[in-house]
Amino acid sequence: MPAPLLLLLTVLLGAPLSTRADNLIVLLDAGSCPNCTLADADLVCADLSDANLNAADLRRANLSRARLDGADLRNADLRFSNLKGASLRGSDLRGAWLDGTDLRQADLSGALINPGALDRSHWLGAMGINQGLRSPASLHNAGVDEANAGRWPQAERLFGEAIQADPEQAMSWVARGLSRGQQGDEAKAAQDLLHAADLLDRQGAPKQSDHIRQTVAKL
């Protein structure tokens, strides 16, 4: 059986008889389905390159390892969808809802994305993300995730990127200092922590600053 027909059969057997199933037929037959309801659809490894999915409802859809290169996903609802390992090279995600979206290991090279749209998604390990698309807060939070997993070099790198994006965030300096301390680099850890203390003094938080200085004195 040809691969496209096999994919269509697999998808339809797993879908209820509903508008969603009709939309799956349209999508897999025509390669496009703007404004379609495709919530919870199973589209693992589907080839949807250049598909028009403008304003499609793809909530919780499983698009892991799908090919969406050049796809029009403007204003699509991708909340809590699975795009892990998907190829989204050159896709248009402007206006797309990405809250809770799993973009880990996805390729976003050349993708068009609104600034801040990735803040509530899971993008760690994604490729091709333009530097300005990740806010200082999202970089810091990703660093916290890596630190909680005990991956200190990765945590240090992400906290460093958060600092580059916003050098006035004292907590990112603290976090990078702690990450460096966990790796045995006490000299650099002390530098980061003392810089954080200086920032906190200037920002009107002397108690926090004093606590950090006391910590450094014990290193």
Q: What does each of the following model-derived ranges do?
A:
Residues 4-15:
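Bacterial N-terminal signal peptides
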Residues 128, 203-219:
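TPR/TPR-like alpha-solenoid helical repeat scaffolds
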Residues 19-175, 179-199, 206-207:
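Tandem repeat scaffolds
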